[in-house]
């Protein structure tokens, strides 16, 4: 990024911040509306190439970004959700942001591959790109500033570690995966498999995408239960919605979730935590979506010319019992 681009964005943030401070001190109007001499404040323009509707986790994450990058904070956030999770619509939005000369692009990709040309275009235009949640493949770190996300590999390892400890005798298990080609899916498989690969007491009897959806999680689980004559002891659902669908399938098969079949999920949405409190899920690994403030800090530091690490990990927690779930529910934000 050139000095001029950095300075332009930094001055915009600083100008808006000083204006807000001045208005607060004087008891003036809403921050972000005007400067002290009556002119409009210069806002830092952020192009957010987003995933769009994809379940409770995504809704919470993208709303958190929009609630953080406000005009009052000195930003003009241009929100561009994908059309039906279509990568082409994202690439078109990304290109439009580059052409319009936004100050920073936040990218949450529907698919990991296919971004090299777009990222090079932004680099040539001196527009910094920050990855939100999902990574890119190949992971060419020179093409973006940083990636901000919980650690998918470690989160999935946590699920596997819990399963090995909770069920020392092992058994048959299946995996409900997200859409093929998404980096998150590959990372979660990598983390989970790194633990289960050395566990001879466990046998993988099925793995199929259910596209992050409850209804597909149910139908895929139904199919795999029938194929294995209900002889499945553990289900790893790579997100909460698929796990909630698996609960329905297990119950309709005449089995008891949590007793006959243990189900573990990733995300930590309120519905999943409630299902754990109700003994229908056995383990929920949080994948914290609320990192708007971390992204805001990264944007400010980037525009100030500071060097950031290639990856900024968002801390997350786990829930391993109904008691832990019940304690968390009153303050659950998503």
Please place each PLM-identified region on the residue numbering.
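Beta-alpha junction/loop-to-helix N-cap segments that form part of ligand/metal-binding clefts
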Residues: 84-85, 89-137, 146-150, 240-244
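Hinge/cleft segment of the Venus flytrap/periplasmic-binding protein
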Residues: 15, 27, 42-44, 176, ...
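Extracytoplasmic "Venus flytrap"
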Residues: 45-72, 78-94, 102, 108-112, ...
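Short beta-strand elements at the ligand-binding edges of bilobed clamshell
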Residues: 79, 138-162, 175-177, 207, ...
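Flexible loop/hinge segments that line or gate small-molecule binding clefts
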Residues: 117-154, 172, 269-275, 322, ...
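Hydrophobic alpha-helical
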Residues: 107-124, 192, 206, 210-274
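Hydrophobic alpha-helical segments within soluble ligand-binding/sensing domains
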Residues: 46, 90, 147-173, 216-218, ...
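Bacterial lipoprotein signal-peptidase II cleavage site
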Residues: 23-38
């Amino acid at each position: 990024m050139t000095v001029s681009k950095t300075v332009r964005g930094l001055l915009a943030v600083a100008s808006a911040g000083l204006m807000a401070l001045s208005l607060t001190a004087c008891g003036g109007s809403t921050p972000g509306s005007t400067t002290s001499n009556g002119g409009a404040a210069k806002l830092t323009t952020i192009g957010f190439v987003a995933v769009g509707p994809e379940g409770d986790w995504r809704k919470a994450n993208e709303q958190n970004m929009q609630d953080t990058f406000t005009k009052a904070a000195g930003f003009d956030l241009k929100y561009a959700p994908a059309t039906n999770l279509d990568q082409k619509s994202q690439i078109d939005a990304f290109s439009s942001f580059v052409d319009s000369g936004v100050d920073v692009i936040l990218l949450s990709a529907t698919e990991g591959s296919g971004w090299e040309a777009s990222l090079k275009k932004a680099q040539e235009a001196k527009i910094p790109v920050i990855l939100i949640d999902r990574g890119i493949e190949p992971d060419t770190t020179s093409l973006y500033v940083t990636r901000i996300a919980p650690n998918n590999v470690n989160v999935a390892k946590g699920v596997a570690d819990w399963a090995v400890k909770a069920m020392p005798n092992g058994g048959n298990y299946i995996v409900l995966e997200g859409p093929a080609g998404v980096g998150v899916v590959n990372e979660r498989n990598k983390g989970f498999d790194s633990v289960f690969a050395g566990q001879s007491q466990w046998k993988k009897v099925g793995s199929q995408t259910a596209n992050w959806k409850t209804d597909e999680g149910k139908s895929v689980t139904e199919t795999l239960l029938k194929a294995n004559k209900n002889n499945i002891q553990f289900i790893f659902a790579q997100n909460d919605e698929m796990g909630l669908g698996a609960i329905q399938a297990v119950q309709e098969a005449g089995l008891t979730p949590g007793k006959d079949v243990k189900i573990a999920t990733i995300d930590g949405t309120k519905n999943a935590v409630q299902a754990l409190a109700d003994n229908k899920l056995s383990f929920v690994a949080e994948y914290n979506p609320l990192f708007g403030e971390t992204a805001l800090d990264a944007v400010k530091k980037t525009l100030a010319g500071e060097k950031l690490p290639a990856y900024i990990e968002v801390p997350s927690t786990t829930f391993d019992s109904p008691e832990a779930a019940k304690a968390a529910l009153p303050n659950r934000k998503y």
